[in-house]
């Protein structure tokens, strides 16, 4: 029965709105969101939830400002919508703190997590839900990354090993600054209008403004034994996400 019902909501029921800074520094897209939801003639229905990444992973390493995130959270509450933070790529220390939204002081109703949460690269995904919102029956939510017993063991081991103290956070912060500095040195060798750094923590990259150029960079890197991805709407950002425990 649950399999046939799927998620209960079609993808067409999602409205996508511009991220922080997308329309330039003079336009606050959080205010735009509030205006759309406050105006019955906007064409945007009242949402069940607002979903946001604090740093856009596949979107091109765009970093949302703290004030913008706080405003979006307040707007969600104002319009009686849940706040969902997608921490799949940016959580578990990738941006230094365990949850990427800690610095902004957010309290999401739902948090999605995966990838690094297993600790050792095993398939695992979690959905953290406020107990008052949990209405799922046993077995109702399933998928290929759910219920992997091996991953549960490694995830617990990783949490106990790396998150008992704040040492990993301090290490990620220091190495993130080092990574930023090195990438800035690379970008400065070229025309600033053609190369600039982006990201936060150990989730950094260089925006080359061209998917073709970025593709050439990762191709040459691969030939030299280094696997690097691209992201952004035109694959124009060379994306560097090294292991959190990598040496300096």
Per-segment meaning from a language model:
Residues 1-248:
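Conserved N-terminal phosphate-binding loop of PLP-dependent enzymes in the Aspartate aminotransferase
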